[in-house]
């Protein structure tokens, strides 16, 4: 974070643990970087009283960065297929 320009935005969608959140909060408060976009956190869900939640230059998502209309469609189609299979007591996707 110390090496970033003041105009930089930090984006993390991979692992929350790769960023020290206390250092990040300080950098945002002191305007050492312009902002942050996070989809992952050290502790999930992010606690309601976490300092990041109160910073105007922090965009926070609830770990949904992977979601697309196509993903949702596949997810719900498979969910219905799984439920129907369970209710009918039929095996699903048998591999031999």
For every predicted segment, state its role.
Residues 1-51:
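Rossmann-like adenosine-cofactor binding region
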